[in-house]
Regions:
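Conserved short histidine dyad/triad with adjacent acidic residue
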Residues: 27-29
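Acidic, glycine-centered active-site loop in nucleotide-sugar glycosyltransferases
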Residues: 133-134, 139-142
Length: 150
């Protein structure tokens, strides 16, 4: 999908096959990488910039009017910390939810099971390992809330 434009009907058709109920107002720039596609739910007017990776072993839900910067990675798969448990070929997945009117900066990583509230800003390059409440700005590795708007 790297050579296709966001305005290319072929590319849009492929996305609509891959992601059920993809709103006509939402844009996913190529290249875009995902595990399955059917675990991704986007609201209206969502913008996903180039070179993002969504590993959707569990649901990834992104609210309306949210902006996703380039090279953002959203992961739902999780593996055990214990090395003996990792020898079993098991993979667990935990859903990721991003609220409405959020801005996820370029290169951010959203880890399994995380919920980011409405109207949040996640700084570029941040690694979000825990939930972020509504109306907050979070930055860093691991991401920490540095400001709340309300």
């Amino acid at each position: 999908m790297r050579c296709l434009s966001t305005y290319d009907e072929t590319y849009r058709g492929l996305l609509e096959e891959l992601i059920p109920d993809l709103p006509a107002t939402s844009v996913i720039c190529p290249p875009f990488h995902c595990d399955h596609g059917d675990g991704i739910r986007l609201g209206e007017h969502v913008f996903v910039n180039a070179n993002c990776t969504f590993l959707d072993g569990a649901f990834i839900t992104i609210g309306s009017y949210t902006l996703i910067g380039p090279c953002v990675q959203i992961y739902t798969p999780h593996h055990p910390m214990d090395y003996l448990e990792r020898r079993n070929p098991k993979e667990y997945a935990y859903p990721v939810t991003i609220g409405e009117d959020c801005w996820i900066g370029g290169g951010a990583v959203i880890c399994p099971g995380v919920t980011i509230g409405d109207r949040c800003v996640i700084g570029a390059g941040s690694v979000v390992t825990k939930d972020i409440p509504d109306d907050c700005v979070a930055v860093g590795n691991p991401a920490r809330v540095i400001r709340c708007r309300m």
